[in-house]
């Protein structure tokens, strides 16, 4: 991710990108934890958007016209904007080709439908999308319902196990928000091998659980169940 700045400025930049994208027939959406935390009434300075319906060259031209693009991972369809903290991504498909959160085959698909784009997310509460211009929330996997009920539920039985770090992320989210993992998510996690996870990624999730959680003990309790 880019270095974070002022979220209000980043949202202004997001709207500028969205307006130009719309003029070309595309749409821009807030995605990920930013949408989740807005619906929870929590502050989140990590402004992330996903731009649909434009080619990479069209998006790059927009960003260059707004001050210059930062190629955070252009081959993966991920950009930044000079002077701002937001991340700008294009829709993509991901497929694990290695073990332990290390190797993924990534295919950028600018015209991927929003449901398919959201399907690569880990949990339903992180798969929400919000139209930057209209504020309309796209909820393909009942993430709003799970937010209201305090339930942590995985999005897809097939893609979720491809990244074993998601087990630790699940425990970390449960601790951070005081949520309860769904029984089917716990059952799925029990079959995932964590032995190949890089130590630094394990440490990162543990650190988040200890420093950001409402109840850090829930991290260990949830992990025990998983």
At which residue positions do the language-model features occur?
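Catalytic cores of the polymerase beta-like nucleotidyltransferase superfamily
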Residues: 1-226
């Amino acid at each position: 991710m880019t270095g974070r700045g002022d979220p209000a400025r980043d949202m202004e930049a997001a709207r500028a990108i969205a307006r130009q994208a719309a003029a070309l027939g595309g749409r821009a959406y807030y995605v990920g934890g930013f949408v989740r935390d807005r619906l929870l009434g929590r502050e989140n300075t990590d402004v992330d958007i996903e731009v649909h319906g434009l080619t990479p060259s069209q998006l790059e031209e927009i960003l260059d016209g707004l001050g210059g693009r930062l190629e955070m991972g252009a081959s993966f369809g991920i950009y930044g904007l000079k002077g701002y903290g937001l991340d700008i991504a294009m829709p993509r498909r991901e497929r694990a080709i290695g073990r332990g959160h290390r190797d993924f085959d990534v295919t950028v698909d600018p015209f991927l439908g929003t449901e398919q784009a959201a399907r690569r997310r880990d949990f339903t509460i992180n798969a929400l999308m919000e139209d930057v211009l209209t504020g309309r929330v796209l909820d393909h996997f009942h993430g709003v319902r799970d937010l209201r009920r305090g339930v942590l539920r995985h999005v897809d039985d097939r893609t979720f196990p491809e990244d074993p770090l998601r087990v630790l992320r699940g425990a970390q989210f449960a601790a951070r928000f005081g949520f309860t993992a769904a029984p089917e998510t716990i059952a799925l996690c029990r079959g995932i091998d964590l032995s190949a996870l890089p130590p630094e990624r394990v440490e990162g999730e543990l650190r988040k659980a200890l420093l950001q959680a409402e109840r850090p003990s829930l991290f260990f309790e949830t992990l025990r169940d998983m």
